[in-house]
């Protein structure tokens, strides 16, 4: 008997610190799916590390929501909500990642 194996591809959006010591991933819905910490990140104070993870998670989330906006616009969906970020808004937030 042959078993059918169904593969599902999960679209992942990442945000990475400038030194690549912290990498945060979210799925298409914006749910966190991973945090990777390199040894350099472990030298940070707990509060600073947490703040950086949150900011990178926010950037990854914004990227996932931008992808949704672009898909909706590509499918000519009318009235794409203002709750979905624009490319300029995501780029502006990305510029605040100074670590």
Region locations from a protein language model:
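Acidic, negatively charged sequence signal
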Residues: 1-23, 34-99
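Short, acidic, Ser/Thr-enriched surface-loop or helix-capping motifs
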Residues: 27
């Amino acid at each position: 008997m042959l078993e059918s194996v169904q593969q599902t591809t999960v679209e992942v959006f990442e945000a990475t610190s400038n030194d690549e010591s912290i990498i945060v991933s979210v799925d298409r819905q914006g749910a966190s799916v991973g945090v990777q910490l390199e040894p350099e990140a472990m030298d940070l104070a707990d509060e600073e590390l947490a703040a950086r993870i949150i900011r990178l998670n926010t950037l990854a989330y914004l990227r996932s929501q931008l992808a949704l906006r672009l898909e909706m616009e590509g499918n000519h969906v009318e009235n794409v909500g203002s709750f979905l970020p624009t490319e300029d808004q995501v780029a502006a937030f990305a510029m605040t990642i100074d670590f």
